[in-house]
Regions:
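Active-site entrance/lid segments in N-terminal catalytic domains of soluble metabolic enzymes
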Residues: 2-181
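A short glycine-centered flexible hinge/capping loop motif at secondary-structure junctions
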Residues: 184-188
Length: 188
């Protein structure tokens, strides 16, 4: 970052399967942190050339609609929405997200087969968050466009038997042929 908080001017876009698929300059996707990942954070991430994500943990459709509208006033760049299935209060959320014109969705905390078909048939790009190889294989079989492989160091709901991202990531990458975003335990 520069002293003014902006991105360095000499930073060049990084072309990967993920950045090409998502239409962003950098293959970085902001985590859909519950109660935090709203339009202000997501727009800052998207405006910096990565992909901002709006979380839907409240389950309140009016609040989600308001955040999506705010996002569109704060950024003209690509962004996505996360559907955390554990918190879904209205089963029409997939249709709602489609109606809002969202183009990218991550699904998490649930079965990848629940919304993938509906979202993809509407032309959306869908990634599913997976904590295990079995979950990754199930998500790929469900037809997701990519995976967010999240080890035990990541936020959210964890199992005490979770493995580290640096163990899980190569295990999954060797067995699937979809773009992968690594999450949890990524530090410098």
């Amino acid at each position: 970052m520069c002293d003014d908080g902006g991105m360095p001017q000499d930073l060049r876009p990084i072309s990967t399967r993920v950045s090409k698929l998502l239409g962003v300059d950098y293959p970085i996707v902001q985590a859909p942190m519950g109660w935090i990942a709203r339009s202000q954070l997501a727009s800052a991430v998207s405006n910096a050339g990565a992909l901002g994500i709006i979380e839907t943990s409240s389950g309140d459709m009016d609040a989600i609609k308001s955040e999506i509208a705010a996002m569109r006033t704060l950024s003209s760049k690509p962004f996505g929405v996360n559907i955390a299935q554990l918190f879904v209060r209205d089963e029409s959320i997939a249709d709602f997200v489609v109606e809002q014109g969202v183009r990218f969705v991550t699904t998490s905390a649930g079965d990848p087969t629940k919304y993938t078909s509906r979202l993809k048939s509407a032309g959306l790009t869908v990634f599913h968050v997976v904590p295990t190889l079995a979950a990754a294989l199930k998500a790929v079989e469900a037809g997701v466009d990519g995976l967010v492989v999240e080890g035990g160091e990541g936020g959210g709901f964890k199992n005490p038997k979770d493995v580290a991202t640096m163990v899980l990531l190569p295990l999954v990458a060797e067995r699937v042929d979809v773009p992968i975003i690594a999450a949890g335990g990524i530090t410098d």
